[in-house]
């Protein structure tokens, strides 16, 4: 009993603490590792596909916004020269059929939600 210690009335043997390593077949462990690596690569591939699609959709949105900005710049230049573009005339008169882009559809959708919220 000279190697063991008595703590709180119990005899403790010296040795390693914690969980003892289980005797796992090395081939099974290697196969699990390979399977985990395959799954990791598949997740990584899906993540990159998602990010590429996200980037391309954002690039398309940026191009559309740039085109819209150019259109507004042209309108401003025309108004600086004293000309009123037909699109602006149509917006001012409320004629939505002649304008390719009108904000009135967005406002009607938003007005439905704001009226139902009771604000």
Swiss-Prot record:
Residues 23-86 form the bZIP domain. Its main location: nucleus. Keywords: Activator, Differentiation, DNA-binding, Nucleus, Transcription, Transcription regulation. Residues 1-23, 95-119 are annotated as: Disordered. GO terms for cellular component: nucleus. CDD domains: bZIP_CREBL2. Residues 29-60 are annotated as: Basic motif. Residues 10-21 have a biased composition (Basic residues). GO terms for biological process: cell differentiation; positive regulation of D-glucose import; positive regulation of DNA-templated transcription; positive regulation of fat cell differentiation; positive regulation of lipid biosynthetic process; regulation of DNA-templated transcription. Residues 102-119 have a biased composition (Low complexity). The keyword Transcription regulation applies. Signal peptide: none annotated. It is found in: Nucleus. It holds the Pfam family bZIP_2. Belongs to the bZIP family. ATF subfamily. Probable regulator of creb1 transcriptional activity which is involved in adipose cells differentiation. May also play a regulatory role in the cell cycle. This is cAMP-responsive element-binding protein-like 2. The lineage of its organism: Eukaryota, Metazoa, Chordata, Craniata, Vertebrata. The gene is crebl2.
